[in-house]
Amino acid sequence: MAQAQYAGTGRRKNAVARVRLVPGTGKITVNKKDVEEYIPHADLRLIINQPFAVTSTEGSYDVFVNVVGGGYGGQSGAIRHGIARALLQVDPDFRDSLKRAGLLTRDARMVERKKPGLKKARKASQFSKR
C-alpha cells in the first residue's frame, strides 16, 4: 500500500508554496535542497516549524516543498501556511489550535504600489513652502 501523503498550498506576498507531508523523521526539503541550505536565516526556519510546534507533531512528518516567487521572508510565510493547511488533512481536530495561532489565515498584506509623482509608494520630495 502506498504511503499516506498530505498536500497543502500556502501563499504569502508574491510567494506560492506547494507542500507535501509524508510520515517520517521531520526532514524538510525546499526546492530539492535541505531547509538549512535553502533558507539561511534561523528565525525564518523557526517560522516554518511553527505549525508543528502548535500541533505537537515535531519530527513526525517529512516535508517536501516547491516554492516560487518572493524573497526568503515571503517564502517562509508561504511554507508555514502550506504546512498548516496540510496538517488539517492529517487531523481536522488541529483546526482549532492552528486557527487560534493564526496559521490558517492568509496574510493579505501586499506591497503598496508606487504612485506617479512620488519617489516610492508614499515618499515624496521635500515640501518647500516658499
UniProtKB/Swiss-Prot annotation:
The keyword 4Fe-4S appears for this protein: no
Any one GO BP annotation for this protein: translation
Pfam family for this entry, one: Ribosomal_S9
GO cellular component, one term: cytosolic small ribosomal subunit
Keywords: Ribonucleoprotein, Ribosomal protein
Keyword hit for Ribosomal protein: yes
Domain of life: Bacteria
GO molecular function: RNA binding; structural constituent of ribosome
InterPro entries given in the database record: Ribosomal_Su5_D2-typ_SF, Ribosomal_uS9, Ribosomal_uS9_bac/plastid, Ribosomal_uS9_CS, Ribsml_uS5_D2-typ_fold_subgr
Family: Belongs to the universal ribosomal protein uS9 family.
Descriptive protein name: Small ribosomal subunit protein uS9
Organism classification: Bacteria, Bacillati, Bacillota, Bacilli, Lactobacillales
